[in-house]
Amino acid sequence: MTEEPYFYHPLENIEDIEVFEDAMERKRLTPKLNEARPYVYFTLEYYDKDNGIRGGGGLGVLAADTRRVAERMQLPFVTVTPFYPVEMHQRLAACEELGGGQSLLDSEATQNVAVSVAPIDEERRVNYADFGFSYVDSVFIKCCGNLCKLDVIEKRFKTTRILAITEPNFGSLYQGLSGSDHRLYQEVALGFGGYQALKLVSLRPAIIQLNEVATFFAALARLDELCKNGMDFYEAMVYVRKHTLYTNHTLVQAAEAEFSHEQFERFVYPNVRSKAVRRWLDGQFTDSEIRLSSVATLLAELKNGVSKLHAAKANYQDANGERVKFKAVTNGIDVFKWVAPQILTFYQKCGIIDSIGCVSANYREALENLTAEKIRELKHGGREIMNQILENYPDQNGKILEFNTDDFVFDFKRRFVDYKRPELAFQDPARLRGVLEPYGAHYILTGRIHAGDENMVQKLQQILAAVERDDYLKTHVHYLADYDEKLAFGLSCGCNTAINVPIVGLEACGTSWEKDVANLQLLISTADGGVADLPREYHLDVTGSSDAEEAESLYARMGEALEIWGNDFDLEYRIGTQLEGFLPIISGARMVKDYLDMTGLTATK
């Protein structure tokens, strides 16, 4: 009988261990990145509309910014993420869609919280081929007794690439509740499927950065392969730990969902081939439940929080009960993506930032060119950008907004979750009116509500009811339903003052405020997240020991912002102070450099 011909397949590559002995001895990684051994960034959230992936909020935007910054820095860098075949959009429901017969905000209905209005999610299918992705091959994972096929697709740039896994039923980001079967399936598919995808294209990571705990299974897949192919478990653990960076964005471990051992039996263990890894993982359960962060910290020697306050306050324990120490690497943004073109040109011409987005050595002196007259001129250009974008975003009354250059506009734009407090400005509607009306000022409110978050739906209903009851607020407070990166950009460019009021101690970093500061908005904020990297004098600080006190502080700060914009000296001083303090923090290139310094990696030319 003739022997079947042998066909080599890239998946037969195993993780090489040629540098293992060296890795055992040194504290830092191989100091060079190259095309075959790139920096690899796993993320379940990735928000990059230009490339067809609309997955997530701030964390997803951060992931996309990180790749763009790496491209500008000419780093060999690979983002591994799902390509979601479905993207979600949100709009305000018309009353008849909810089964009611009253007007959208009927005057009698507004006396009751249960007004006939709520955000509705709409699905839109997305085809990866429409965004320049090409099909590579398929890989398989095992779940619930089934062999699940995942298509591997990629899009290459000069030095970076997006390597994605996808399948028609993958769903949208975070489809299902935390701890649900579908959520676990998505995480397992990204981890085990994404690791196979790297092998498929013959890439061997110099470092794997886990962008939040949902990507834990990538490190587990690497550990499993090393053990399955003959490496001693403890040696493999050392190797994986020295080549893994875990980035945490959540302050309180108790807020993280748990998965059961029974779920792992169906979704995880069918993909684990090493008995040693299986035995180790079994030992990490407590009362048949597991939090992925407790094991992610064991697989990553390098761990960071995303602001100074977050790194200091994050309350995490590993599976051994030991307090986890995080290094601070504050999130940054891609200034070339998020700063209005005319402002960016000014920064570059004056020598405030360099070609990759880092501040120059003499940026403080260069900021002296930013006069009040120049600020107003640049913001007028930003207002034009905002008005063009707003043509596609009607407010709660179906009105298309257009603002004059002299109109004063506050904005609150961020994901609608309880701790970010979109309702704080509406604690006292009469007081809010008293702040806005003398200046004819407007207030824009926008942010996505997660499906099933009835608490935030109710808070939105309360806000809209309060707005409708007041004849000034109903024409000057505007809720925009379908919050996305385009709208976020427009508002950052064109609004005067940004409002950022998370409960202190609950915001890991936040990046919306960074975009606002870079676009010459005044920042009103509590001292939380990345804002707290600097003392309180660098922003208009909201304080208080209760919501009522903080609301009153917010109103006072809003009044102060209105006065500042009317005084050239104060405007120049305040905007200059913000930029002097925050520009180095805001820089995404600074953030990437911090990660390279943390890992000891540099790029070969």
Segments the model singles out, each with a brief description of its role:
Residues 1-605:
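Catalytic cores of carbohydrate-active enzymes across secretory and cytosolic contexts
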